[in-house]
Structure formats: structure tokens, C-alpha cells
């Protein structure tokens, strides 16, 4: 999960709309939220970020640059719908949507003590995608 990217506005807005939290609350959270990630995710929220990293990695393997992709999405009631676009745009939107919905489901696991968590404290095996 990287919040310093071109799709920051869309992903950040999605996070705010679905969770009520600032998108910055997830930047630097645990072992996976923010730039890179390794070892064992700390909790369900961190697992959402690991899954998001895996989703982006899959897009990159198909020659897409998800961190540079911009997309449109719509919020109808509480439902996110990705707009039309090329496969990279729609794929990036789908990854971001899945992460945001995961954050919403994992809201009870969120711990302030994992904000800006030192990556050097991350332990265990890195799970596969």
C-alpha cells in the first residue's frame, strides 16, 4: 500500500468515504501499509495492506504501473463501483476497492500502537501472495 502515488486522490478518497479514517492513518501502519513490506503482517488491517501489495504486484507483472494509474469510481450508497477505462485503470481501481473494503471489515483490529511501526520490528516469514 503506497499513498504517495498518482492514484493517491482516488484511493485516499475511497479510504475516507468507506472507513471514515484519514488515508494517512494507514500510511506506515504495521509491516505492509506504506512503501514495501516484509515478514508477518501484524493484524487483519496489515493483512489488507499485504493483499493490496500482492494485487499491485500482479498488475505490474502484466506491464501495468498501478502507482501511476488514475481511474474513476463512484460511490452509490455504500457501494464502490469502478468506472470504465483500460485494463490497468480498472485493475488498479479493483485493487484499491478490495483494500478499502478489507480495511472496513478489519476496522476492529486497527491499533494506534502500529502507526509508524518500525519495519525492523517485523518478524516471521513473509506470506506468499
Regions found by a protein language model. Give the residues of each.
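Extended terminal accessory/targeting regions
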Residues: 1-129
Amino acid at each position: 500500500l503506497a499513498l504517495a502515488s498518482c492514484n493517491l486522490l482516488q484511493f485516499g478518497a475511497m479510504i475516507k468515504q468507506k472507513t471514515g479514517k484519514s488515508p494517512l492513518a494507514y500510511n506506515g501502519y504495521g509491516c505492509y501499509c506504506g512503501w514495501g513490506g516484509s515478514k508477518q503482517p501484524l493484524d487483519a488491517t496489515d493483512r489488507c495492506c499485504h493483499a493490496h501489495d500482492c494485487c499491485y504486484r500482479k498488475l505490474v507483472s502484466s506491464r501495468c504501473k498501478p502507482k501511476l494509474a488514475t481511474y474513476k469510481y463512484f460511490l452509490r450508497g455504500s457501494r464502490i463501483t469502478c468506472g470504465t477505462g483500460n485494463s490497468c485503470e480498472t485493475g488498479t481501481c479493483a485493487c484499491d476497492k478490495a483494500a478499502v473494503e478489507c480495511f472496513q471489515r478489519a476496522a476492529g483490529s486497527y491499533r494506534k500502537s502500529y502507526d509508524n511501526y518500525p519495519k525492523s520490528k517485523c518478524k516471521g516469514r513473509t506470506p506468499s501472495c
